[in-house]
Amino acid sequence: MAGFPGKEAGPPGGWRKCQEDESPENERHENFYAEIDDFAPSVLTPTGSDSGAGEEDDDGLYQVPTHWPPLMAPTGLSGERVPCRTQAAVTSNTGNSPGSRHTSCPFTLPRGAQPPAPAHQKPTAPTPKPRSRECGPSKTPDPFSWFRKTSCTEGGADSTSRSFMYQKGFEEGLAGLGLDDKSDCESEDESNFRRPSSHSALKQKNGGKGKPSGLFEHLAAHGREFSKLSKHAAQLKRLSGSVMNVLNLDDAQDTRQAKAQRKESTRVPIVTHLTNHVPVIKPACSLFLEGAPGVGKTTMLNHLKAVFGDLTIVVPEPMRYWTHVYENAIKAMHKNVTRARHGREDTSAEVLACQMKFTTPFRVLASRKRSLLVTESGARSVAPLDCWILHDRHLLSASVVFPLMLLRSQLLSYSDFIQVLATFTADPGDTIVWMKLNVEENMRRLKKRGRKHESGLDAGYLKSVNDAYHAVYCAWLLTQYFAPEDIVKVCAGLTTITTVCHQSHTPIIRSGVAEKLYKNSIFSVLKEVIQPFRADAVLLEVCLAFTRTLAYLQFVLVDLSEFQDDLPGCWTEIYMQALKNPAIRSQFFDWAGLSKVISDFERGNRD
């Protein structure tokens, strides 16, 4: 094929040859026809009498239009494209005779092309034509239809037509790339706009001398590579889906509720804990409501939260952690209690696992709350305008009260009881509000609440829980009168509580009262537990740590039988006891930080 610049024979009529100069205009023309060269046939038979003798005449391909840019050919009302560069078109556009050498063009121009104007006329901008009604409101004209096989192309839709050859080669190249002419995922109109234009890349690869055969080779070579990659990607996708299906062992995760929860934007609690905030220091008194199931602790907390608003922080019972995180510990515990499988090691192991899970939220929250305590400000007596931190249960119930009840019921062994007891911790300022209620009324409220896992509980269970609270309360009274070391000596059998009373220089209570408290307290049970190994230092240290920690607490007793459906009256009793007891003190907390921590616990409990 002859090179583009340097053609000697000038074209007739409105056509002119391209001069070899460095002008920007000719450079632009050169770039344009270099791009056309990518799609033009390698051999073009010249027509007419102006073809040079003895040389390959490609003037029909390399003629430069007088005006720039070449415009798109108009279309008919039916959307069909009119023939481009036919004998009539060349005659009307360039003024050439039918015998002119420029009677045809091997390619069709895109939509909107117009014939070049004569040399003496100034180029004018094309006038946009309104879209034809036949196209429809949802159909868009195909901008690449000039690259397709059409019935308007010279030569018809046969295998010898150059336009048909280009279209066929392009479709083969797309098939090599894994792209069909009409994808299953898109409509025909959408597929027209997704056809890649590869002539620029082909031009750069061939040094500006792209050929049709190079286009097909380029598409075929890369098509094989892309088809392999797409095949491998599809295999990996199917494999990953199979692995995920195998790992998805819990069918409950695919329920509608689980999917809705995954879509919701949730905040990770530890992020809010570490977020910087402006500390707001406030004095607050910590109260922990305790009692048997169904006495009305949650009802009281909801009432106080509605009354005091921002002056209170209510910490709910971590029921969701106990029932929805891993196994349901509440259900497992009541199952062991109702089956009455006493004195078995496997039952004790299951009960121990449940009790250790019950203690976890209380220990975590106590540690977090301790970090927000302003120790520099110290503690003070409770004032009327102080804030309140109200908890639904203390660690005391999970690590001391209920394990003691299970030990007496022979559902927990001595060894497992010591393990749970060793987890008990408390801070100075923690006040236990023991809400007492007679068994009959308590049973009525428990049935009214109607929790499924509590349906097997009876009056005997509630009585044993109340007895366990009473034993812990009697032990706490002893810690207020005697030193922890003396109490441990009594538990180890080194002395008696009566001897300790007589040896005291200033006896506070009589020995008979002390002996009665000791027999009804948890210390009498501890003496029985550690008696076989009373010389073991670990057991003695567990007892000593428990006695010292128990002395940190303060107790407030409320008999709910006197306040039947009287929540304000019940709170008044609690409030007055807190004001009158000088040992119950308020501490200073970072109120803003504590509010964020508790809000995260409440959010997790609601979900």
Curated annotation (Swiss-Prot):
Gene behind the chain: TK
Active site: E317
A GO BP annotation: DNA biosynthetic process
Domain of life: Viruses
Protein name per the record: Thymidine kinase
Further facts: Phosphorylates and thereby activates certain drugs like acyclovir (ACV), valacyclovir, and famciclovir to a toxic form, that leads to successful suppression of the infection, while the uninfected cell does not have this ability because it lacks TK.
Enzyme Commission code(s) on record: 2.7.1.21
Binding site for ATP: G291, A292, P293, G294, V295, G296, K297, T298, R445
Biased composition, class Polar residues, residue ranges: 88-106, 148-160, 194-203
Chain sites annotated for binding substrate: Q355, R451
UniProt keyword Kinase present: yes
Organism, as annotated: Epstein-Barr virus (strain AG876) (HHV-4)
Family: Belongs to the herpesviridae thymidine kinase family.
Region span, Disordered: 1-160, 180-215
HAMAP family (UniProt xref): HSV_KITH
InterPro entries named in the record: Deoxyribonucleoside_kinase, Herpes_TK, Herpes_TK_C, P-loop_NTPase
Keyword Transmembrane helix: no
Entry function: Catalyzes the transfer of the gamma-phospho group of ATP to thymidine to generate dTMP in the salvage pathway of pyrimidine synthesis. The dTMP serves as a substrate for DNA polymerase during viral DNA replication. Allows the virus to be reactivated and to grow in non-proliferative cells lacking a high concentration of phosphorylated nucleic acid precursors.
Keywords: ATP-binding, DNA synthesis, Early protein, Host nucleus, Kinase, Nucleotide-binding, Transferase, Virion, Virion tegument
Xref: Gene3D superfamilies: P-loop containing nucleotide triphosphate hydrolases (3.40.50.300)
Localization: Virion tegument; Host nucleus
A GO-annotated cellular component: viral tegument
Record's catalysed reaction(s): thymidine + ATP = dTMP + ADP + H(+)
UniProt biased composition (Basic and acidic residues): 17-32
Main location: virion
